[in-house]
A protein has these predicted regions:
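An alpha-helical support segment within catalytic cores of ATP-dependent transferases
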Residues: 10-28, 167-223, 364-367
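Catalytic activation segment of kinase domains across protein kinase-like and atypical kinase folds
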Residues: 228-258
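ATP/Mg2+ or Mg2+-diphosphate-binding catalytic cores
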Residues: 236, 273, 278, 310-374
Length: 374
C-alpha cells in the first residue's frame, strides 16, 4: 500500500468522522495500524471527540483472496457491492438485537464508497473459537465448559434473531431446493481420484430420500456463521462479524456451519479429531440448538444432512489449499485429510439415518416452527 493511498484514506476517514461526531472530532496524527486478513484490509484509527474522549474505530475494506494490493480492492465493483450489502445488513442486525440485553451488534458508523470501506467501532471482544483451546482432548474442566456454554447458547439465540429479522414467508421442501445436486456432484468428482469416496454417496442419497419432502423455512443467511465470526464482549454480550450474506436460503445452512465448526476447522483435521473432545460434541450441539429453537420442534435428519454437506464443502476447501503444496506433500496431506473427512461425514449421515428411522423428525405434513423472536 502506498503512502498516498493511506493518506487519501485517512483524509476521507477524518472528514467522515467530523460529520458523524461533529466539528472538533480529530484523528490521532499517528499513522493507523494496519491488519491484513485473508478477506479484508483493516486499519485501526483513534479519534479525539469534541468532549475529549478518545474513541477507537476500525476501517474495513473487504477483498477477495487473490487481491494483494489495496488498489485492487478499492477499484473492484464486486467489492463495492459487498461493502454496500454489509453496511445495510449490519445496521439491520443492530436494529434486530435492540432490546435483547445479552446480545449486541456492531453498527457501522459510515460507509466510504470511494474506498469500498466501512467504518465501525472497535469493540472489545473475544472470539468464541478461542474457547476451544481450553479443552484438553482427554479431560474437560467443568468450569471452562460452563463459561463456554452460556455464550454458545446465546450464539444460537442470536442466529435465530437474525433469521427472524430476514425471514421470508416461504417454506420449501428440500427436494424443491435441489439440495442433493452439489454434494452428489462433489462426491462423484472426488470419487474419480479416490474410489472410497463413492461409499459416501449411497448413505447421502438414502438420507436425502428420507427428508426430501420436509419443508424448511427460508431466511437471509449469514452464510459464514461459525465460532470465528461470533464474539463475546467483556460484559458477556454475544454478537457476530463478517456476514457473507445470502438473501434467501434454508436456515439449516447457518446452523450446520456453526454446529460442524469444531469438527471441521483445520487444527481438528490435522490432529485427526483429537483437538475437540468427542465428549463435548453432544453438549455443544445441544447448547446451540437450545438457544436457537427454544423448545420448538425441528428435524434432526435435516440438520445432520446439512452438517454432512457442510463437512463436504470444508473438505473440498482444504483440498484446494493443499494443491498449493509441492506434489509429494500435497499427496500425503490429501490422504490424511481424506481419511478424517470420510469418517466425519459418515458419522453425520449415520446419525441422520438413525434419527430418521426413529422418527426423530417432523411429519412430512408439518412445517417447522415459524421464525419469530422469543
Amino acid at each position: 500500500m502506498s503512502s498516498n493511498e493511506l493518506q487519501h484514506l485517512t483524509d476521507a476517514v477524518a472528514h467522515q468522522m467530523s460529520l458523524v461526531f461533529g466539528e472538533g472530532a480529530n484523528l490521532d496524527p499517528a499513522t493507523p495500524a494496519g491488519l491484513h486478513r485473508r478477506y479484508s484490509f483493516m486499519f485501526h484509527y483513534r479519534i479525539r471527540l469534541p468532549d475529549g474522549i478518545i474513541k477507537s474505530i476500525i476501517v474495513k475494506i473487504p477483498r477477495d483472496a487473490w487481491m494483494k494490493t489495496l488498489h485492487e480492492a478499492i477499484s473492484s465493483d464486486h467489492i463495492r457491492g459487498i461493502i454496500t450489502t454489509e453496511f445495510e445488513i449490519l445496521n439491520a442486525i443492530a436494529d434486530a438485537v435492540e432490546g435483547e440485553p445479552l446480545l449486541c451488534a456492531i453498527r457501522p458508523l459510515a460507509i466510504l464508497p470511494e474506498f469500498n470501506a466501512v467504518v465501525m467501532d472497535n469493540v472489545q471482544m473475544r472470539l468464541l473459537k478461542t474457547s476451544l483451546s481450553r479443552f484438553s482432548p482427554t479431560w474437560v474442566n467443568s468450569e471452562d465448559w460452563k463459561q463456554f456454554e452460556g455464550p454458545l447458547e446465546l450464539a444460537g439465540k442470536l442466529l435465530r434473531v437474525i433469521h427472524s429479522r430476514f425471514a421470508t414467508t416461504q417454506q420449501e421442501s428440500l427436494e424443491s431446493l435441489r439440495v442433493l445436486e452439489n454434494p452428489a456432484e462433489s462426491l462423484d468428482a472426488l470419487g474419480r481420484h479416490d474410489r472410497s469416496s463413492n461409499a459416501l454417496l449411497h448413505p447421502l442419497i438414502d438420507l436425502y430420500e428420507s427428508v426430501k419432502s420436509v419443508r424448511v423455512p427460508l431466511a437471509g443467511l449469514h452464510n459464514d456463521y461459525h465460532l470465528g465470526n461470533v464474539f463475546v464482549t467483556p460484559e458477556g454480550k454475544v454478537g457476530t462479524l463478517d456476514p457473507n450474506w445470502t438473501a434467501s436460503g434454508c436456515v439449516y445452512v447457518d446452523l450446520a456451519c456453526i454446529i460442524s465448526y469444531p469438527q471441521t476447522r483445520r487444527v481438528q483435521v490435522l490432529t485427526q479429531g483429537l483437538r475437540f473432545p468427542s465428549s463435548l460434541r453432544e453438549p455443544y450441539e445441544t447448547a446451540l440448538l437450545r438457544g436457537y429453537f427454544t423448545g420448538a420442534q425441528f428435524s434432526y435428519p435435516v440438520l445432520y444432512f446439512y452438517c454432512a454437506t457442510a463437512a463436504l464443502e470444508k473438505w473440498l476447501y482444504i483440498e484446494d489449499l493443499l494443491r498449493e503444496l509441492p506434489r509429494a506433500g500435497s499427496w500425503a496431506a490429501s490422504r490424511w485429510v481424506r481419511h478424517y473427512f470420510h469418517g466425519l461425514i459418515r458419522q453425520y449421515l449415520e446419525q441422520g439415518l438413525k434419527a430418521s428411522a426413529s422418527n426423530r423428525q417432523l411429519d412430512d405434513r408439518e412445517h417447522l416452527a415459524p421464525l419469530s423472536c422469543s
